[in-house]
Design a protein with these regions (language model features):
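Non-catalytic structural scaffold of enzyme domains
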Residues: 1-202
């Protein structure tokens, strides 16, 4: 594409509050899938060719979405796995909301690709989740939270991880690759690059 050119983009965003209701209540992922399908139908009518979702956590609903989706999706964990392979990483530490890191989104894709992974401890999952929802989503960043998160990454390093997945859109606000004890895979940026490549190829 030429100067100032880029693929057409259309976005449809349902309030995070609507997604969090079934997730936090334990109602399961089917209600989340219905919200995603609502967006998918809207974007198809707008002329989209394929879909992406930068929210790592709600990818757990994709198995309920894909059989009924009017358009194909790029999977964020699969794209992160591809990037890890490209960069030669063999064992990844997974960070994100407690719903993500305790779930199957990354393990399923990474296992299929032959990449080892490590989850944070239960205590670390809870504390990082608190940092995300009580601070980062509100635009707040504290030195104490940065120190804690760096210690989580350091624990991955001690246990043999050679990179860490920033599996939440807000986590790059807290730490970047220059500050991280391990190379950091920014899942949102990785998905964005994959989407651009997919659009240009199509």
């Amino acid at each position: 594409m030429g100067r100032h050119a880029h693929p057409e983009l259309t976005m449809h965003t349902i309030s995070l509050a609507e997604y969090m209701k079934p997730i936090e209540s334990g109602a399961g992922w089917k209600p989340v899938a219905e919200l995603m399908l609502r967006s998918a139908e809207t974007l198809k009518r707008a002329g989209a060719d394929f879909l992406i979702c930068p929210d790592n956590t709600i990818h757990e609903a994709l198995p309920f979405v894909l059989p009924r989706s009017p358009l194909p999706w790029l999977h964020i964990a699969e794209e992160v796995g591809k990037e890890a392979k490209r960069r030669g990483f063999r064992k990844l530490g997974i960070t994100g909301t407690k719903f993500l890191v305790s779930g199957p989104v990354y393990p399923e894709k990474l296992e299929q690709m032959g990449i080892a992974y490590l989850r944070p401890t239960r205590e670390q999952q809870e504390q990082v989740n608190t940092i995300i929802f009580d601070e980062l989503v509100r635009g707040q960043q504290t030195p104490e939270s940065l120190f804690y998160f760096e210690q989580v990454i350091e624990s991955f390093k001690i246990q043999g991880c050679d990179a860490v997945v920033l599996g939440c859109t807000e986590l790059p606000l807290l730490v970047n690759e220059n500050e991280s004890p391990l190379p950091a895979l920014d899942s949102t940026r990785t998905l964005a690059r994959a989407a651009l490549q997919h659009a240009l190829a199509g």
